[in-house]
Each structure stands twice: as C-alpha cells, then as structure tokens.
C-alpha cells in the first residue's frame, strides 16, 4: 500500500471551535499521523500521512469539520512522505 502525505490549509470559522481537537480525533480514528496547527490568518494547517484511501476519507470529514465550525475552502497539496508516529495539535 502506497503511503502519502498531504498538506491542507482550511479556511473559514476553524479556530476557537474545537477544530484541531476533532481533526486529530478523526485522523487517529483512521490511522493517520500528522498535525493540525492554527495559523495567524485564522486558518488551520493540517498535515496528514497515511494511505491514499484513508486520506480521502479524512478529506470528506475535513470538508465539513466539527459541528461548530464552518469550512469555506481547503487548499490541498501532496508533500514529500513524512514518517510520523502520532497526530499532534499546535
């Protein structure tokens, strides 16, 4: 199974609504690693590493986000594979 890494930049109402916590929970539930980090512009940067099919499932959730969030747009780019062991929040 081919392992991939993707970097997402999520814009909308995604800070102070539990977005990073729920992002980490959903990523770990799918067996993905990476991180979620608040950005100064109000967006959240998310790196996920794992199988392409699991990343696609994660992206379906990310497009909606948790109940209190509002996702307006997501930029996505494939990045070089990173061997991470956990999912962190910054």
From Swiss-Prot:
E.C. number: 3.6.1.7
Similarity field: Belongs to the acylphosphatase family.
Protein name (Swiss-Prot/TrEMBL): Acylphosphatase
SUPFAM superfamilies in UniProt: Acylphosphatase/BLUF domain-like
NCBIfam families listed in its UniProt record: PRK14426.1, PRK14451.1
Membrane-spanning intervals of the chain: none
Swiss-Prot/TrEMBL catalytic activity: an acyl phosphate + H2O = a carboxylate + phosphate + H(+)
Residue ranges of domain Acylphosphatase-like in the record: 5-90
Gene name, Swiss-Prot/TrEMBL: acyP
Alphabetical UniProt keywords: Hydrolase
Keyword Hydrolase attached: yes
GO molecular function: acylphosphatase activity
Leader sequence residues: none
List of catalytic residues: 20, 38
PANTHER family (UniProt xref): ACYLPHOSPHATASE (PTHR47268:SF4)
One Pfam family matching this protein: Acylphosphatase
Hydrolase found in the keyword field: yes
Coiled coil location: none
